[in-house]
C-alpha cells in the first residue's frame, strides 16, 4: 500500500467482532484490522499471548472493540459507510449485541496502518501443540509444537479470538491420522491449516467469499502442506465425498441453516465442531442439532462464546 488511505471503523463489542469483520470482507477493502481489549487486559503478557492490536485499545479498559477496514481514496467512502451502517443495523435487529455500533472514517497514511500494527502481532500458542505465527516473525518450535504460518493482513481470523481458539482445541482432540476434514467458511484458512498440521489425511476449505478463498490459498502456500483444497461455493455444491469432521466457525443462525447439509456431508459417527455462538443462541443450536439426529458431546465456553461438538448418530 502506498500513499493515503481511508480507515472505516466500527466501534463494537468483542462478541460482534467476527460478523462485523465479515461485513468488511464482503467489500473490496485492502485490509482489515481487529482490536479487542479483552485479548490483552487481564492476561500475563508474553511473546505468545499477543494478537495484533493497536496499543491504544488499552485505553478502552475492555469496554469496546474495534474493526477497521482500509480503502483507497478512489473508493466512494460515503457509499461504504452507508453500507456498513446498514449491515451493522441488521446485526442489531438479529439480536446480536454490537455495543455502540458506531461507524467512523478517517484519512490515514500508509505508515499508520501498513507497518505500525505489525509490531503488536506476535506468535500465539493455542493448547500444547499449535502456534499461529505471522509470516514476518521468527519462531523456533520446541517439542511437539506445530507452527501455522499466517498473513493476518488478509486473514479473517488470527487465532486468538475465543471462537477460533476453541475450534483449534477441538480439532486437536478429534483429528486423527486418517481423518478427512471439511472447513466451512474457511476465511483465512486457519482451521484447515490446523487440521492439516495435526495430521488429517485430507482437508477441504470452502467459502462463499472469493476474497477469503484467495486469502486461504495464499496462507496455505506459506505452509509446507499438500493435502488442502480450497473451493469457492456452498458445501454440498462443490465438495465430493464425505468427511469425518466438519468444522464451522460462523454465527449461530447460519449454523442452524447448514445443519442439514452438514448431516449429508458427514460419515456415520462423524463429528461437527461449530463455534461463533453467543450464549443467547446456544440452546437454539443445540435444539437444531438434536432435531437433525446429532448427539451433543461437548459445550465449551470461552468469554461470551460457545463451541459445540456433536456426533452424527
Curated annotation (Swiss-Prot):
<dbReference type="GO" id="GO:0032259">
    <property type="term" value="P:methylation"/>
</dbReference>
<dbReference type="InterPro" id="IPR050078">
    <property type="entry name" value="Ribosomal_L11_MeTrfase_PrmA"/>
</dbReference>
<comment type="function">
    <text>Methylates ribosomal protein L11.</text>
</comment>
<protein>
    <recommendedName>
        <fullName>Ribosomal protein L11 methyltransferase</fullName>
        <ecNumber>2.1.1.-</ecNumber>
    </recommendedName>
</protein>
<feature type="binding site">
    <location>
        <position position="164"/>
    </location>
    <ligand>
        <name>S-adenosyl-L-methionine</name>
    </ligand>
</feature>
<feature type="binding site">
    <location>
        <position position="249"/>
    </location>
    <ligand>
        <name>S-adenosyl-L-methionine</name>
    </ligand>
</feature>
<feature type="binding site">
    <location>
        <position position="207"/>
    </location>
    <ligand>
        <name>S-adenosyl-L-methionine</name>
    </ligand>
</feature>
<dbReference type="InterPro" id="IPR004498">
    <property type="entry name" value="Ribosomal_PrmA_MeTrfase"/>
</dbReference>
<feature type="binding site">
    <location>
        <position position="185"/>
    </location>
    <ligand>
        <name>S-adenosyl-L-methionine</name>
    </ligand>
</feature>
<comment type="similarity">
    <text>Belongs to the methyltransferase superfamily. PrmA family.</text>
</comment>
<keyword id="KW-0808">Transferase</keyword>
<keyword id="KW-0949">S-adenosyl-L-methionine</keyword>
<dbReference type="GO" id="GO:0016279">
    <property type="term" value="F:protein-lysine N-methyltransferase activity"/>
</dbReference>
<keyword id="KW-0489">Methyltransferase</keyword>
<dbReference type="Pfam" id="PF06325">
    <property type="entry name" value="PrmA"/>
</dbReference>
<keyword id="KW-0963">Cytoplasm</keyword>
<dbReference type="GO" id="GO:0005737">
    <property type="term" value="C:cytoplasm"/>
</dbReference>
<dbReference type="InterPro" id="IPR029063">
    <property type="entry name" value="SAM-dependent_MTases_sf"/>
</dbReference>
Amino acid at each position: 500500500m502506498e500513499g493515503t488511505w481511508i480507515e472505516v471503523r466500527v466501534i463494537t463489542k468483542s462478541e460482534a467482532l467476527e460478523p462485523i469483520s465479515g461485513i468488511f470482507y464482503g467489500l473490496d477493502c485492502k485490509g482489515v484490522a481487529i482490536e479487542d481489549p479483552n485479548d490483552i487486559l487481564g492476561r500475563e503478557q508474553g511473546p505468545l499471548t499477543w494478537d495484533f492490536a493497536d496499543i491504544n485499545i488499552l485505553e478502552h479498559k475492555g469496554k469496546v472493540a474495534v474493526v477497521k477496514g482500509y480503502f483507497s481514496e478512489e473508493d466512494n467512502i460515503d457509499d461504504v459507510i452507508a453500507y456498513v451502517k446498514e449491515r451493522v443495523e441488521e446485526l442489531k435487529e438479529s439480536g446480536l449485541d454490537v455495543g455502540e455500533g458506531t461507524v467512523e472514517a478517517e484519512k490515514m497514511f500508509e505508515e499508520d496502518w501498513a507497518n505500525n500494527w505489525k509490531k503488536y502481532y506476535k506468535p500465539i500458542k493455542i493448547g500444547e501443540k499449535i502456534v499461529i505465527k505471522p509470516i514476518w516473525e521468527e519462531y523456533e518450535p520446541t517439542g511437539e509444537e506445530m507452527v501455522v504460518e499466517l498473513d493476518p493482513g488478509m486473514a479473517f481470523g488470527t487465532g486468538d479470538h475465543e471462537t477460533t481458539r476453541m475450534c483449534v482445541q477441538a480439532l486437536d482432540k478429534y483429528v486423527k491420522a486418517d481423518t478427512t476434514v471439511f472447513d466451512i467458511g474457511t476465511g483465512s484458512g486457519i482451521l484447515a491449516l490446523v487440521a492439516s498440521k495435526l495430521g488429517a489425511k485430507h482437508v477441504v476449505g470452502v467459502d462463499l467469499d472469493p476474497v477469503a478463498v484467495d486469502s486461504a490459498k495464499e496462507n496455505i502456500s506459506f505452509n509446507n502442506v499438500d493435502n488442502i483444497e480450497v473451493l469457492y461455493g456452498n458445501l454440498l455444491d462443490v465438495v465430493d465425498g464425505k468427511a469425518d469432521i466438519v468444522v464451522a466457525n460462523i454465527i449461530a443462525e447460519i449454523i442452524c441453516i447448514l445443519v442439514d447439509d452438514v448431516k449429508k456431508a458427514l460419515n456415520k459417527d462423524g463429528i461437527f465442531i461449530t463455534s461463533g455462538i453467543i450464549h443467547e443462541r446456544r440452546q437454539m443450536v443445540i435444539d437444531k442439532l438434536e432435531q437433525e439426529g446429532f448427539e451433543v458431546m461437548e459445550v465449551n465456553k470461552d468469554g461470551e462464546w460457545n463451541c459445540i461438538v456433536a456426533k452424527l448418530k
